[in-house]
């Protein structure tokens, strides 16, 4: 999410960020989370792209790679692990912990042995949803320590309130390392507080040796920084016990809150949380960690908002069912799988075995786009090329506007204290992506209205608004096809006057970081197309009309 957020919202080059951090912390190993064959994107990449990405991360200052696969398909870890080892860096193989009828302690032990056999230097238990219970943690760590010889590290989120107790039981069982966050940046969607864990272990055989007074200096430094970015946190104030049932990780929870708000459907949160376990079961009890958390989450939102389960199936959900992401822990729903396979067979081999080397092709595409758009590249072209390879549309948009801060989200205002009075009612002008918006805010800080503005701050004319949001005029003839979600038009797959049959893909919509294929519900002729590629659309807005 860090890489994505840098180019999507901040207008910041993530490669520069790595270099700058390494520059001020030359003695401290820099660690990154790498999604195996997914890298940082939302699909599988060819082996040559994976190897080149690892090369560049090492070149820019990363030396510890926590490598995992969202499906826990160990085959998807191998290329990234091999390349990390080849470059002399630390490869930490990871199991994505989850709870389901098919996930047993023996399954985790078998995965750990596979990771050790790959040559990984250490093992991480990644408890992204905070589902690891303290006594289960003790038994799991105890058995893993007996099964493998490499060091074991625990990464547990605090969202459910279990993490600190689980950390202590893991320590008692012999865990080698645990992840924590400095106190002022800890808990809720994050991790247990470093200060607290250090204090708990102070008089034990596993005393850390860390100085609480020095930790307090760090704590104090980050306190106002957390306040500065508080608007981007979720609504959670204590613990969220719903996660013990829905198994939604904290990062996914905040993401879903924001996404539902963007869809004007914040009131549907509980319905979506209830739908998530059902979708997860249909998709073979896959763990909920990026990118599968987004895949399951987006599909759940679609099922709720459209009023019909799987009326619209995202490209990524179909990919899970087809085997494009690897093997699932349990069998997927057969009827749903048959619907997306359309008579073909699911993939059973390592998915990347079916992907031809693509680095050269990506470079040719990239060079063509750069030349057409007149984009100025970074000093090291390969950094920009990899940004494009992982995030084609967002990456090019970032590269085009790298020197235009108005295109991206404005930086939040610095605040001196977390104690703020309720926001006053008022009207404000905000600039984003080169456009101005007039925003009306109620007492308490809720946005009640947002309209595009002209350069002088007045509400924009209709013609100005059409540059920002696609034309909403609905033709009177035929059946209008509306957008199931708010998002951006990625591709228009048909032309005006084209004949289509039931099931044909009409438009690909990028919404909630996923690609959603909008298909024809019946055959006919496209009589009007109301949008073009790159347009922003809202829920229900007419995309095209079929007669």
Regions found by a protein language model. Give the residues of each.
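Alpha-helix-loop-beta-strand connector modules within alpha/beta enzyme cores
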Residues: 8-33, 80-96, 137-154, 198-210
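Structured functional modules or segments
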Residues: 469-547
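Terminal or standalone catalytic/regulatory effector modules within metabolic enzymes
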Residues: 1-6, 237-240, 251-460
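Catalytic cores of alpha/beta
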Residues: 106-111, 160-175
